[in-house]
Design a protein with these regions (language model features):
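C-terminal transmembrane-bundle signature of multipass membrane proteins
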Residues: 41-149
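Generic multipass alpha-helical transmembrane bundles of integral membrane proteins
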Residues: 1-59
């Protein structure tokens, strides 16, 4: 929990490469599985929390994601926006776009996984018990942005 007035939920170990990997995977999933809603359920939701993480407050992407997802869920369950012409977006249903986005997501996520395994082996840290990326400047910046210090 942040040591600031906001008392934000902090996950300092959730760094930019993990966030980008998740965003790519989630967008690929939305575009492949719910194409008609991918613009809203995927792109808009992901951009909003990722923008907030990179440009408003660092280290609390998970909280940004939970809040934007909750607001979108309440809105989409209360308003049938898909039936309104002004919200209508026709998906391309383009197999090339699906494949490229999915391949990019798979490659980026595999790279993050390999990097995480390398860090685990090199530092002998158990990711279930200790934070993994304490050696990176981005980790320290996430802590500092929330009034916290490394232990």
């Amino acid at each position: 929990v942040a040591n600031t007035k906001s008392r934000d939920m902090v996950w300092a170990d959730q760094l930019w490469f993990w966030i980008v990997a998740y965003d790519l995977w989630n967008m690929a999933y939305c575009y492949n599985c719910i194409s008609t809603r991918a613009m809203y359920a995927g792109f808009a939701l992901l951009v909003s929390c990722t923008f907030a993480e990179f440009f408003i407050k660092r280290g609390i992407w998970l909280q940004h994601r939970a809040q934007t997802l909750a607001l979108f869920g309440m809105f989409s369950l209360a308003v049938d926006y898909q039936a309104m012409p002004m919200f209508s977006i026709t998906a391309t249903y383009n197999p090339t776009a699906w494949t490229v986005l999915s391949a990019l997501a798979l490659i980026f996520n595999a790279a993050v996984f390999v990097y995480e395994v390398c860090v685990i082996v090199k530092t002998k840290r158990n990711p279930l018990k200790k934070e993994m990326f304490t050696h990176l400047p981005a980790y320290r910046k996430n802590l500092e942005a929330n009034g916290l210090r490394a232990e």
